[in-house]
């Protein structure tokens, strides 16, 4: 019983985290500062990171 509940919580948490991040199109970057502008236009937040040469935007909290 507990194993099923833990597995369900793990799946739900993974799905929530997956849908929280979005790619900022095909914007190439070499540093996180280059992602702030494009991510602010998409998500109204500057929460972003340059990963593998592409911008990744994170949604606002709150």
From Swiss-Prot:
It holds the Pfam family Toxin_2. Transmembrane segments: none annotated. Expressed by the venom gland. C-terminal amidation is important for activity. There is a 50-70-fold decrease in ability to inhibit Kv1.2/KCNA2 when the toxin is not amidated. This decrease may be explained by a 23-fold slower association rate (k(on)) together with a 2-fold faster dissociation rate (k(off)). Keywords: Amidation, Disulfide bond, Ion channel impairing toxin, Neurotoxin, Potassium channel impairing toxin, Secreted, Signal, Toxin. It comes from the Eukaryota. Disulfide bonds join 29-50, 35-55, 39-57, 45-60. The keyword Disulfide bond applies. The modification Valine amide is found at residue 61. The record marks 49 as: Pharmacophore, responsible of Kv1 potassium channel pore occlusion. One of its GO terms (cellular component) is extracellular region. Has the structural arrangement of an alpha-helix connected to antiparallel beta-sheets by disulfide bonds (CS-alpha/beta). Reversible blocker of voltage-gated potassium channels with fast binding and unbinding kinetics. Has highest activity on human voltage-gated potassium channel Kv1.2/KCNA2 channels (IC(50)=0.11-0.16 nM), whereas its affinity for other channels tested was in the nanomolar range (hKv1.1/KCNA1, IC(50)=253 nM; hKv1.3/KCNA3, IC(50)=91 nM; and hKCa3.1/KCNN4, IC(50)=70 nM). This is Potassium channel toxin alpha-KTx 6.21.
